[in-house]
């Protein structure tokens, strides 16, 4: 069963990469109760990024434990042979990297045919112009604000102007494409990412490294709401 896609203005997507895997079911239930909108699942192959994590079997297990949409991020080379595996496992959103896919239009179309929402991710040094040709095929753009592979890194501030540029491209296209930021997101800096134009926020240690997930997520929402309001007012002027 694919989780129902909810649609609040701003979404928090806790990354289970930073969860306690010995208590993964409990952790997933806890972040759902704490007010998460998505659950972010990082899949790493040890080639595209220097780390090896999980696959469809864990996604399937997480799917059984929550009704939230599963936001699955494939940090892997040649993801195409595995798309149907993640669809069967229960992924709601499946994101591939522009740097890792040869025929991006075809891959995104196949993700949609399999009943999932299609996402495209860019590494910090990848120029935004590379995603413009596929905006009609994407439901979500994920901007990495750290170099992918490991949790607990600090946000690269130079990524913020890139988020602004991608937001401009999305507005120009006139499609409801979500703009997600992933890497180093915490209570203290989530407002800057929202001000730049992001509307989905992945946070691993920024949530799972705190004592009270609900308090942390509530604080994040307080920090993003005024920032987005300020940004919208400037666009209207």
Could you say what each language-model-derived stretch is?
Residues 91-99, 194-203:
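Short, electropositive alpha-helical surface patch
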Residues 191-192, 200-201, 208-210:
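Catalytic cores of soluble, metal-dependent hydrolases
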Residues 99-101, 123-124, 146-149, 205-208:
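Short, acidic/turn-prone active-site loops that include or flank metal/cofactor-
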Residues 184-196:
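Acidic, divalent-metal-coordinating active-site segment for phosphoryl/phosphodiester hydrolysis
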Residues 2-95, 100-103, 110, 117-118, ...:
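Conserved N-terminal beta1-alpha1 strand-loop-helix module at the mouth
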Residues 1, 227-237:
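Short, low-complexity, charge-dense intrinsically disordered segments
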Residues 179-184, 202-206:
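Glycine-rich beta-strand-to-loop/alpha-helix junction loops that act as flexible
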Residues 125-127, 186:
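Short acidic loop-to-helix transition motifs that present clustered carboxylates
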């Amino acid at each position: 069963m694919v989780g129902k896609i909810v649609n609040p203005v701003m979404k928090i997507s806790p990354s289970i990469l930073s969860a306690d895997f010995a208590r993964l079911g409990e952790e997933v239930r806890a972040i759902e109760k704490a007010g998460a909108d998505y659950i972010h699942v990082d899949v790493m192959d040890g080639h595209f990024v220097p780390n090896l994590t999980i696959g469809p079997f864990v996604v399937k297990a997480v799917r059984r434990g929550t009704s939230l949409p599963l936001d699955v991020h494939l940090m892997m080379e040649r993801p195409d042979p595995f798309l149907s595996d993640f669809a069967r496992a229960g992924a709601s959103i499946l994101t591939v990297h522009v740097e890792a896919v040869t025929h991006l239009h075809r891959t995104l179309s196949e993700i949609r045919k399999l009943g999932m929402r299609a996402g495209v991710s860019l590494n910090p040094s990848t120029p935004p112009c590379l995603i413009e040709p596929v905006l009609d095929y994407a439901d979500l753009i994920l901007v990495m604000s750290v170099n992918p592979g490991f949790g607990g890194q600090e946000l690269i501030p130079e990524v913020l102007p890139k988020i602004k540029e991608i937001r401009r491209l999305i507005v120009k296209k006139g499609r409801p494409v979500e703009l997600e930021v992933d890497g180093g997101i915490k209570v203290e800096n989530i407002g800057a990412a929202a001000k730049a134009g992001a509307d989905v926020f992945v946070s691993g240690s920024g949530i799972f490294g705190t004592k009270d997930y609900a308090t942390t997520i509530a604080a994040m929402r307080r920090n993003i709401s005024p920032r987005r309001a300020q940004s919208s007012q400037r666009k209207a002027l």
